[in-house]
């Protein structure tokens, strides 16, 4: 209940700042919008991870319960309109160490994946109805998280029925070719991300979508799907 109250206060203030910016300028800038990249529902089991304080600890059940209350408070209870848009991050199997996050390949068993790393995300998607999900920097089971058939197509949208938008972590799409070495360049990375359902990129990579279309690596239909 306390977490719900905290998130409600956050979204109250966020709404106020949003409307104030619109009245003053006619538009909003960074930190004046209604999309909140929170909560962080990664499981904190490695003390080397310097961002552990953002999470709710090592327990998947507790994390899911606390984060669900946060999402409901942030997004509000109107059946038609969102008060603000929450974002479940970082999807998935992202728990440090921070130094290796741009190139790390998380190898986990199916049991570890479903029992430890995914339950909080599932609860936010299927019960709290979180509006967005942020892909992690790392690879999971050899697939980059922001273009993972397993995580995005099969589980998130296939098993859980997620119908919100997927956003990359900032510069995660550049990691495809700079660190993970799974693509050749930015245009190739944009095509791969669109193919597996990353709708929004937090870096320059999606600026190369026209090049990817010209090459025949992606299609306008996939761009339209991301914009739906």
Labelled PLM ranges:
Residues 1-228:
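Glycoside hydrolase catalytic-domain context in secreted enzymes
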């Amino acid at each position: 209940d306390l977490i719900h109250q905290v998130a409600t206060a956050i979204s109250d203030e966020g709404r106020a700042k949003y409307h104030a910016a619109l009245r003053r300028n006619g538009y909003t800038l960074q930190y004046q919008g209604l999309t909140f990249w929170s909560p962080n529902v990664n499981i904190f089991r490695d003390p080397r991870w310097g961002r552990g304080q953002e999470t709710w600890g090592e327990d998947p059940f507790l994390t899911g319960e606390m984060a669900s209350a946060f999402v409901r408070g942030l997004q509000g209870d109107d059946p038609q309109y969102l008060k603000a848009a929450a974002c479940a991050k970082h999807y998935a199997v992202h728990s440090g160490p921070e130094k290796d996050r741009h190139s790390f390949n998380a190898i986990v068993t199916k049991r570890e994946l479903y029992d430890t790393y995914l339950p909080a995300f599932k609860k936010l998607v299927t019960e709290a109805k979180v509006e967005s999900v942020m892909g992690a920097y790392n690879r999971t089971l050899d697939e980059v998280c922001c273009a993972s058939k397993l995580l995005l197509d099969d589980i998130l949208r296939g098993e859980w029925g997620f119908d919100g938008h997927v956003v990359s972590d900032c510069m995660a799409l550049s990691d495809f070719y700079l660190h993970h070495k799974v693509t050749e360049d930015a245009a190739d990375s944009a095509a791969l991300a669109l193919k597996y359902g990353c709708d929004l990129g937090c870096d320059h990579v999606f600026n190369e979508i026209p090049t990817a279309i010209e090459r025949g690596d992606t299609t306008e239909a996939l761009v339209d799907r991301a914009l739906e």
